[in-house]
Amino acid sequence: ATLSAANDAKNTDGLAARLTGPQLEIHTARIAIAQKTGSVSKFATIPEDIAQTVIPTDSGWPRSVFTITTTTEDQQSKRLLVLTQDSARQNYKLWGVARLFQGAKLPNFAVPKIGSQMGTAKDTGLTMTPQEAVTQYADVLTNGANSQYAANFADDKLRQTIAEQTQNV
């Protein structure tokens, strides 16, 4: 309800109560763009119906919950939501959203009733650490095809949308 109200009013008041980290920055930027263009991007829609949730087994904080949504009413792809809780007495806040394009492959999660251990930004055993992936992808989003990391990532819809919005604003 808070995000819908913010989108409808094109106002960022109250977003920090529900969003944090990169998602707060992204949604704040989307509303700033909407204030200039007159409408919020349809890609800002976050489906409310949940297909799967992975609860953490970690006993400490911060904690993260991973949720996969259903498709939107206008048939946009599912989303992977990452919600974080900084302490036991704070509510979870939406930290990140990733659109899951058709054919996207996710690592296997532990049985949802059991939960999964939280990874770290420096976990190895993947193509690159999560920290390296974020740094490199941010460089690609900033510099497009001129990024030294452009070959490491597919030319996805997010890159195309950001490039298009950058040209329009």
Residue ranges and their predicted role:
Residues A34-R79, V169:
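Surface-exposed, charged secondary-structure patches
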Residues A1-Q35, F109-V169:
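Core segments of small alpha/beta cavity-forming domains
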Residues R63, E73-T135:
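Short beta-strand edge/turn micro-motifs at domain boundaries
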